[in-house]
Amino acid sequence: MTNRQWETLREYDEIKYEFYEGIAKVTINRPEVRNAFTPKTVAEMIDAFSRARDDQNVSVIVLTGEGDLAFCSGGDQKKRGHGGYVGEDQIPRLNVLDLQRLIRIIPKPVIAMVKGYAVGGGNVLNVVCDLTIAADNAIFGQTGPKVGSFDAGYGSGYLARIVGHKKAREIWYLCRQYNAQEALDMGLVNTVVPLEKVEDETVQWCKEIMKHSPTALRFLKAAMNADTDGLAGLQQMAGDATLLYYTTDEAKEGRDAFKEKRDPDFDQFPKFP
């Protein structure tokens, strides 16, 4: 594996947020519990992803887990209380749902770099990422029905779009675990590489993506998400279109005419069939 010098962009307690040549990397840093997340972990990830979204130097975002044994094993069951996962404020919550939506709407590609276990809510995080590079030691699966939990959102509905309804029901009803090759065969990941090469491969994919039009990638992500995200997905795509429209001379003519208190001259712009 190439020895890269990742730059720390911000210090957190339960995650790492680093940068390397246009790539932001968010790492769940709780290896002692297989990178299970708490409300604080999720809040920190939301903050880091929001910063990556706004950072003009960031083109692609990588989500991973600390160490080689786990990407993420889902919510920390020791923090689960009455009504949700209890944080330092003693309020039960499921803020991981906010994180899932954020990953979906960020107008930049998000790649899951999976080493070891991606189970439970960890597999759902894998599911909502745009692409997945899996190490050959990766293990995938859902655990909810075993521990009195479930994900009736992206973790089931969108999972079924990816692997098919029959396979998704198998994953949830049986709570089995699947190795990296099995995950590749069902379309849950994009590629499988040796553990020692997983970061090299992920960075290579990032660099290939970064050669392409960020506006085109933004619209492609929004278009593919709109199919499964309903009106929220359409809203995101419409917002992306509006931002692009604002950069055109046609939009600027309307704005300038209003500011200059005159009628806009829209006849000068083409009306393509």
Curated annotation (Swiss-Prot):
Annotated NCBIfam families: menB, PRK07396.1
Keywords: Lyase, Menaquinone biosynthesis
Reaction catalyzed: 2-succinylbenzoyl-CoA + H(+) = 1,4-dihydroxy-2-naphthoyl-CoA + H2O
Cofactor or coenzyme needed: hydrogencarbonate
Assembly notes: Homodimer. Can also form trimers and higher oligomers.
Family note: Belongs to the enoyl-CoA hydratase/isomerase family. MenB subfamily.
Keyword hit for Endoplasmic reticulum: no
Entry protein name: 1,4-dihydroxy-2-naphthoyl-CoA synthase
Function: Converts o-succinylbenzoyl-CoA (OSB-CoA) to 1,4-dihydroxy-2-naphthoyl-CoA (DHNA-CoA).
GO cellular component: a single term: cytosol
MF term (GO), any: 1,4-dihydroxy-2-naphthoyl-CoA synthase activity
A GO BP entry: menaquinone biosynthetic process
Residues marked Important for catalysis (site): Y85, Y246
Enzyme type, top EC level: lyase
Disordered: region residues: 254-273
Ranges of compositional bias, category Basic and acidic residues: 254-265
Known EC number: 4.1.3.36
Source organism of the structure: Staphylococcus aureus (strain COL)
Pathway it works in: Quinol/quinone metabolism; 1,4-dihydroxy-2-naphthoate biosynthesis; 1,4-dihydroxy-2-naphthoate from chorismate: step 6/7; Quinol/quinone metabolism; menaquinone biosynthesis
Amino-acid positions noted as binding hydrogencarbonate in the UniProt annotation, renumbered to this chain: Q142, T143, G144
Keyword set includes Lyase: yes
Cofactor note: The hydrogencarbonate anion plays the same catalytic role (proton acceptor) as the side-chain carboxylate group of the essential 'Asp-185' found in actinobacteria, archaea, bacteroidetes, and deltaproteobacteria.
